[in-house]
Amino acid sequence: MTENRRIKKVNSLLREAIANVILKDVKHPKISNQWITVTRVCLSKDLHSARVYVSIMPHENTSAETLDALKASAGFIAYKASKGVVLKYFPEIHFYIEDIFSPQDHIENLLWKIREQDKN
């Protein structure tokens, strides 16, 4: 139980630290001009690997291009984030897209169809 609580706490700290690094320190053109939100971090039980889920609102690049740039910058992001979160071993980070807008779009489409049916 204590280990589970510790992992949740470290997940929260990592999410905040990684988000700050992406916002303030990463100068990659495919990252710095995008709206990127770190939605959650899932740390492995051995604390050596972390899956970082991001939501990307494309502006100049596609989400896939931005995700590739994040993956390429993962080492730098981990290095900078490790300065803010002190752990014996800083986890290797892996980025994944979490499409939080897709369910919202689906619901809006359903509501629009219902409104259209009510008009007829």
Swiss-Prot record:
GO terms, biological process: maturation of SSU-rRNA
Location(s), subcellular: Cytoplasm
Keywords: Cytoplasm, Ribosome biogenesis
Pfam families to which the protein is assigned, alphabetical: RBFA
GO MF annotation terms: ribosomal small subunit binding
Main location: cytoplasm
One GO cellular component term noted in the UniProt record for this chain: cytosol
InterPro entries per the UniProt record, alphabetical: KH_dom-like_a/b, RbfA, RbfA_dom_sf
Function noted in UniProt: One of several proteins that assist in the late maturation steps of the functional core of the 30S ribosomal subunit. Associates with free 30S ribosomal subunits (but not with 30S subunits that are part of 70S ribosomes or polysomes). Required for efficient processing of 16S rRNA. May interact with the 5'-terminal helix region of 16S rRNA.
Similarity comment: Belongs to the RbfA family.
Subunit relationships: Monomer. Binds 30S ribosomal subunits, but not 50S ribosomal subunits or 70S ribosomes.
UniProt protein name: Ribosome-binding factor A
UniProt source species: Chlamydia caviae (strain ATCC VR-813 / DSM 19441 / 03DC25 / GPIC) (Chlamydophila caviae)
Name of the gene this protein is made from: rbfA
